[in-house]
Amino acid sequence: MSQSTRFAIALAFLIAVPARAQQTPVSFTKPTQASEAVANPSPMTPRQAAEMHADIMMARKEYESAAGLYEKILQSEPKNATLLNKVGVAYQQLGNLNKAARYYKKAIQSNKSFASAINNFGTVEYEKKHFGKSIGLYKKALALRVDMATVYSNLGYAYFANKEYPKAMDTFQKALAMDPGIFEKKGGNGSVVQQRTTTDPGLFYFFVAKAYAQAGDAERTAHYLKLSRDDGYVEFLSAQTDDAFARVIKDPRVQEVLQVPPSYAGPTKKQGSN
């Protein structure tokens, strides 16, 4: 066993031991079988420790190392859909879209109902600007798992990029209903990739502001309106007369953004609070 493997096993074992168990004072009473099980958790197998080591490399953003570690495990488990998906995520983080797509396809072939891998394959197609293909993949993922806010968010991005704006708005609202903070999350290194780029940031931020406004979230509405304004979306002042903003338009935070139109906003006069 190599030194790195020993280190990974030791690290995994330490992580597996609950902190409270490590701090529990010594008892002089005879332990029960249950307490013995808590005090002496079963150590991870070398296989489990190897995957955890790779997961740690992903968390550290050491994607190349993580991919290599996952691929070593795949040598003995070539049809492990979860591992295939994780390798795909690692290569996507490295910018190798073709290799990422290859692993996502293998994961889907191994488990045709693996919604995460289908979603991730959709994000690759999105990054390649194949918006129609990405929409189809996101819909397929949602047919398998209707509870994934990230996939709804990704589908909204794809509709937006494809200029299907009403569908984008409807999908964003579904994502927000499941997770109000969905647009504030980073893509991360998990098994489900979240899209983070868009074709027209200013307009996109305006759409997100509108979705939050319809949900009655004034704070986030103001935040995304400001992003839209600062990114150069010249129509951001239309929020003042857009019925979608009616629930939050009088909120001081929203009004503050609308009271300071930038120079590119044209001759529209500064509006007072209603």
State where each predicted segment sits.
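Terminal, low-structured helical/coil segments at or just beyond the last alpha-helical repeat
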Residues: Q23-R47, K186, Q195-G202, V208, ...
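Alpha-helical segment of the N-proximal tetratricopeptide repeat
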Residues: T45-T82, K86-N96
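Position-specific recognition of the canonical hydrophobic site in helix A of tetratricopeptide repeat
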Residues: M58, N85, V89-Q92, Q109, ...
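Structural signature of tandem alpha-helical TPR/SEL1-like repeats
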Residues: R60-K72, Q93-K106, E127-K140, N162-K174, ...
